[in-house]
Amino acid sequence: MTSRGTGRWIIPKGWPMKRKAPHAAAAREALEEAGVVGQIDKQPIGSFSHEKLLKKGETIVCDVQVFALEVTHQRKTWREKGKRSVQWFSRAEAARTVREPVLRDIIRKLGKRS
């Protein structure tokens, strides 16, 4: 999917949620941002840092934990539908498409998990 601001290809991300474990918050963000539902791993498969531009023009560094989600289906409608482009890629295509080098490596290793 693309970011709303820059239109670059990203994975669903969000802020920590009160009373939600990190993996549950990640599953919620995936639903809200890309409309996908499935089984999510409870442990992160990797992490990376990126700069986020806030509404007031301020930039902050965010540490992102990445959780694998085995998608079972995509809903016909979801909260942010129409605000982003959503597209399915092969693992190799996805790795080439994202900008963050660490995220590229995480995506490439997805098929090698046990």
Predicted regions and their residues:
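Polytopic alpha-helical membrane proteins, predominantly small-molecule transporters/carriers
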Residues: 110-114
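N-terminal strand-loop-strand
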Residues: 1-12
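Unchanged
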Residues: 16-105
